[in-house]
Amino acid sequence: MTASPKDEMWTVFKRLLGYLKPMKGMFLLSVCGLIVYGLVDAAFISFIGPFIDKGFSSSTPAISNGIALPTSQGFHADNQVLLMAPIVVILMFSLRGFANFVSTYGISYMSARLIMDMRQQVFEHYLSLPVSYMDKENTGNLISKVTFDTEQIARASGSALISIVRDGVTVIGMLGLMFYNSWKLSLCILVIGPIMGLVITIVSRRFRKVSKQIQTAMGDVSAATEQMIKGHKNVLAFGGQETETARFAKINDRNRHQNMKLAVAQAVSQPLIMVIGSFALAFVLYAASLDSMKADLTAGTFATILGAMMAMLQPIKNLTRVNAEFQRGIAACTTVFELLDTLPESDTGTYTVKRAKGNLRFDNVSFSYEGQERRALDKIDFEVTQGQTLALVGRSGSGKSTIASLVTRFYTGLESGDIKLDDVSIYDYSLKSLRSQVALVSQQVTLFNDTIANNIAYAYPGEATREQIIQAATLAHAMEFIEQLPEGLDTQVGENGVLLSGGQRQRIAIARAMLRDAPVLILDEATSALDTESEKAIQQGLDNLRQNRTSVVIAHRLSTIESADQILVVDQGRIVERGTHKSLLELGGMYAKLYQMQFGS
């Protein structure tokens, strides 16, 4: 049985309030400021009646022989009341201004803190999610949750607090004032209350639905923009400007269309509420003209009731306006909380080791990616011991990189078999301990927008010495180009190393793996971006790195794995051949054909 939209909204709202607990002092201060602000408005209207009735009174007619004669002396004013009025007004509005400052500052502080806390939580949660989740999610939507959705939540929270407390107190104060002065005239408000409530309920559902659609549309905008920026060179090279422009225009127009839906709902709801309110005001004016009412009304009383009704219109309008903002925030909360409720990467293992020997074994491993029927790996079985090099070769999509990904538990859920490191299942290791035993250099190098030195020492921030960094860079043959840079190791590489060539980025990644000094080394096309000369230069460094380490090398260039202790030929998830370079050539099978394609006879 699913929860009703009302129950779901209340659940989300209660969860959101949990973020305000650490700021309860500031929250209470802001609420007090808002209450004072609303009460001052109500108090100001309450002074209208006494000010008119006592400050001014009708001119007293002259009496001659029992006949009242009109005079031209105007009103008889109570000077004491008139003298006090300016002082009261100044004091009240000074108090109102101070209350406004306190509440505005407090709400701004809480909104900024809420954005910071939620963004931090979402960012940290991304780091705990499995690779399989990140693979299937739209990057633009993930970024939008950190940037756009958290802003929506904070804005909605601030607007809702201001309107619900300040405008709510104002409306309640005005209603109390009206009933105190004339409960008969004030009863008409109770008639329109349910009608207003019905309109707000209907519009709220529309707001929430459209707001979710807006968040999806914003994610699409972010994704399309990111895709164009990342592929900017390819777009220009292949003349894809018109295609990308048309694609973005379509997505952009969809986003505009969703925003217009929300604008229409807002534009209809606010005037509708005001029209309903005008009927109440018109009824009060009509009722005041009835003889039965005149006996109970003074000029001051009527002015107070009329002023209170007029003063209520703007707060009521604000409450209907904030409803749209609030529903937008609730929709954003729902998407963010759904993300935060996504289960993090499974880490049930408890086994830890400072440094493993590096004996790696696959025991009859079968594996399928989520949502795919065909097995990515089918009964993979091999063993590689400390100091040995295992090479994986085969066509693209044959399953080589999947084997490497399973070693680091980027993907879990084996259909059969087990993977063991030093005769202990990798699923018994804690994730931190397991991954500290592995150094990975993948085909697609990731560098961070930082210095070369910090990228090399990424696994040991603040711990690796300058000498260790230089040594790793030297072994990777990276110092050759680093020394030619104006700032050397302190050179900023730009976003994802954009200021460096592909080969330079690859060498920095290799230096990073060297500094890691892990017992298991995975090289997934580690030299793919290097030219022949650079590849030869770095090969000696890789040979040095492999000593006393278990190395798993994935390569298309067969020249880089000729010295491997064992070569596995993988095709459609199965091991079809295994042996040394020499024995596989003599076998004359798939490996020999691949070798012949690259080097001829």
From Swiss-Prot:
One of its GO terms (molecular function) is ATP hydrolysis activity. It is an enzyme of class 7 (translocase). GO terms for cellular component: plasma membrane. Keywords: ATP-binding, Cell inner membrane, Cell membrane, Lipid transport, Membrane, Nucleotide-binding, Translocase, Transmembrane, Transmembrane helix, Transport. The chain crosses the membrane at residues 32-52, 81-101, 160-180, 183-203, 267-287, 296-316. Residues 28-328 form the ABC transmembrane type-1 domain. It is a multi-pass membrane protein. Residues 360-597 form the ABC transporter domain. CDD domains: ABC_6TM_MsbA_like (cd18552). It catalyses: ATP + H2O + lipid A-core oligosaccharideSide 1 = ADP + phosphate + lipid A-core oligosaccharideSide 2. It is found in: Cell inner membrane. ATP binds at G394, R395, S396, G397, S398, G399, K400, S401. Its main location: membrane. Its EC number is 7.5.2.6. Disulfide bonds: none annotated. The keyword Manganese does not apply. Belongs to the ABC transporter superfamily. Lipid exporter (TC 3.A.1.106) family. In MsbA the ATP-binding domain (NBD) and the transmembrane domain (TMD) are fused. Homodimer. Involved in lipopolysaccharide (LPS) biosynthesis. Translocates lipid A-core from the inner to the outer leaflet of the inner membrane. Transmembrane domains (TMD) form a pore in the inner membrane and the ATP-binding domain (NBD) is responsible for energy generation. This is ATP-dependent lipid A-core flippase.
